[in-house]
Amino acid sequence: MLKVLLVHDEPIIAQGISVLIDWEKYGYEIVDTANNGLEALEFLKHNSVDLILADVKMPVMDGIKLLKTIREEKLSDAFFVIVSGYGDFTYAQQAIKYKCTDYILKPVQKQQLLDLAVQVKNLYSTREEQKTEKEEMSRAYFVRYIQALLLGRPDKEALEYVSGKMKFSQN
């Protein structure tokens, strides 16, 4: 199950988003609802999520500032979606700058959330596949370089790669 954090200062809208679609049917679990960006940051310091749905205008900390803080401080690599009543291109432009996954205008329609659920699920799968491929490639390089070292054919590249991947004790 992918974990979802809702961030909205209007409880009725947050609840509406949580019941508009059957999140579990699509492989999602809403793990928490925060009333503003600051509450969301506190939650993210101790919990990981895969998707954040946040309003733009909220007291204390708005959605754009939340997104910016998350990205700059590397608090989460969750997919981030802005839910806004503002069609102003300036907000969308700022959101794109900080790698926002999507920008949905209110009132949120059921089909929009369904499409979003499918889109994020596909993006998540692609990211996980890429991560696995990268780990496998790294492991293959490591084995290749270790073999070269064990066979007595060390080169500078092999030594640097292996020493970068291993911790040697200095006793």
Per-region residue spans from a language model:
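Receiver (REC) domain active-site loop signature in two-component systems and cognate sites
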Residues: 58
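Two-component/phosphorelay signaling modules centered on CheY-like receiver
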Residues: 11-32, 46
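Alpha4 helix (beta4-alpha4-beta5 surface) of REC/receiver domains from two-component response regulators
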Residues: 65, 76, 87-102
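Active-site residues of response regulator receiver
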Residues: 8, 55
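Two-component signal transduction core modules
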Residues: 52, 80, 95, 103-104
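Helix N-cap/capping motif at the beta->alpha junctions
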Residues: 33-42, 63-65
